[in-house]
């Protein structure tokens, strides 16, 4: 009996709350979470409050004509909501974040003219949404607006729309047709991420900017045409688009062209991106090219080799990795060079110049060697090297970047000659099958590696013995313009075989320039060496350039 009175008392106390749960104060509607069925928002309402209908059981809502704002999460997680309509003459101006997100039964909606702003994730994860009408007064499609709307098959963006924001259509896996308006100015990062239904794509004139990875993982996309109006692009617009055969550019553009199906700047100075299905046994980068952009040949399995001009000034991260390249051909210059078949560059830091291991040919087999004198291994440097079985790291190595050994399927052994473990990031070994890899270090370094962040993830062995190999293989180049000989008095004698004046520079294997001189046509000269050892001799003239190893 006492329990009955207690329950009755609770009911009496809660009754006023239930009766007053739905409230309208100063035109703001709130507390509708207990509603179900059809609901018409009264004309006196000018604003629907945050979470007003959150997780309610309403099935249909008519938004009154005087509502100017629908606030954050107002209808979020309404699992039974099927229909939303707006009264004739709607004055709606603003929609907040997550307003209609996670409404799995909502199939269609027509937003009224006059709407000026939508918040992020407006229709996020509405798996039944098939038809959407947007007003011409809306100039920005917000971040994550239609993300994971998997039933959406076609979309038409109205005139007046200017910006497609980050991840706006990400995960719309069945989106097959997108009509972009002529007023679109920019397309943001991953705007069309994983749109598996897209087969062809033509970006309309007027678009000036497309950010990196805008069409990433459009895995069935075969052809794409970019507009002549395009002025700026990010890195790897079409990353992980394995069926893409060519990137075309409409004629008349001032900033971009397509050459061999590859996206270039109009003056050929920058190579931006090759499509995944681009084929070449040895692609020769144009002599005019000064920059190879980040990820330019990433995931291009049918490119077997590349020849890079000596005039290159910049090569971006992951530009030459995770593809089918078995070798790089490159004469080298003051900033970039090849050694042991791998690409290196000289970086300027607060501690001075540092040698960075940048890329190893993905199709190369056997052992990969990071040469003595190298300070850092770049992000993705050996990504996709499926056939390397071992890796040697020098005692001079200070650190390694992210995804360095991603997808190195046959890697079994890593030999590190550094007593102090090189610094790793949490992503350095990402994508590597760690249980199958053995780390070999000197006995005195064993405990340090076992305690070092991320090194402890690898099986350890203290079986490294002997001295670290410091000899360095130079690029396979024919030096026909310079003859040299070494005398026991420590002098290196040089003789020019060229008809042009050349610059001759001598380097240590860790990249330090020891001597530089100018050699006239067919002249002789000499350099006094500090000690016997291994050196790099670089000669450069207007006719040719070469690098070779000198062992004294």
Language model feature labels by segment:
Residues 450-471:
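A recurrent domain-boundary module in secreted/ectodomain proteins
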Residues 1-5, 552:
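Positively charged n-region of N-terminal signal peptides that target proteins for export
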Residues 427-432:
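A structural signal for leucine-rich repeat
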Residues 22-23, 33-47, 56-69, 79-94, ...:
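Structural signature of tandem-repeat unit edges
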Residues 7-16:
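Bacterial N-terminal signal peptides
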Residues 471-552:
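C-terminal outer-membrane/trafficking sorting elements
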Residues 50-52, 72-74, 96-99, 119-122, ...:
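Consensus positions within tandem repeat domains that build extended binding/scaffold surfaces
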